[in-house]
Amino acid sequence: MAKEEAIEIEGVILEALPNAQFKVKLENSLEVLAHVSGKIRMHYIRILPGDKVKVQISPYDISKGRITYRYK
């Protein structure tokens, strides 16, 4: 059985939480808890409240996600 593909959607950072986690409001007005992907962490890209980001969400649990890109 193949693994389901992640859903990619854009959102805005609402607040920064401990352990490199963020509360993100998605463009469909859903709020998710998201952590930073390894590449963003590796390159020391700062993410602040108000930043527009791309989030990957698993189809199995839509309350959690992974931030994969920060728009300039």
Swiss-Prot record:
PROSITE patterns in the record: S1_IF1_TYPE
Spans through the membrane: none
Gene Ontology molecular function: any one: rRNA binding
Recorded superkingdom: Bacteria
Main location: cytoplasm
Gene Ontology cellular-component annotations: cytosol
Signal peptide: none
InterPro entries documented for this protein: NA-bd_OB-fold, RNA-binding_domain_S1_IF1, S1_domain, TIF_IF1
Compartments reported by the entry: Cytoplasm
Keywords assigned: Cytoplasm, Initiation factor, Protein biosynthesis, RNA-binding, rRNA-binding
Domain S1-like: 1-72
CDD domains: S1_IF1
Coiled coil: none
Subunit architecture: Component of the 30S ribosomal translation pre-initiation complex which assembles on the 30S ribosome in the order IF-2 and IF-3, IF-1 and N-formylmethionyl-tRNA(fMet); mRNA recruitment can occur at any time during PIC assembly.
Family of the protein in this entry: Belongs to the IF-1 family.
Biological function: One of the essential components for the initiation of protein synthesis. Stabilizes the binding of IF-2 and IF-3 on the 30S subunit to which N-formylmethionyl-tRNA(fMet) subsequently binds. Helps modulate mRNA selection, yielding the 30S pre-initiation complex (PIC). Upon addition of the 50S ribosomal subunit IF-1, IF-2 and IF-3 are released leaving the mature 70S translation initiation complex.
Protein name in UniProt: Translation initiation factor IF-1
Organism: Chlorobium luteolum (strain DSM 273 / BCRC 81028 / 2530) (Pelodictyon luteolum)
Organism lineage string: Bacteria, Pseudomonadati, Chlorobiota, Chlorobiia, Chlorobiales
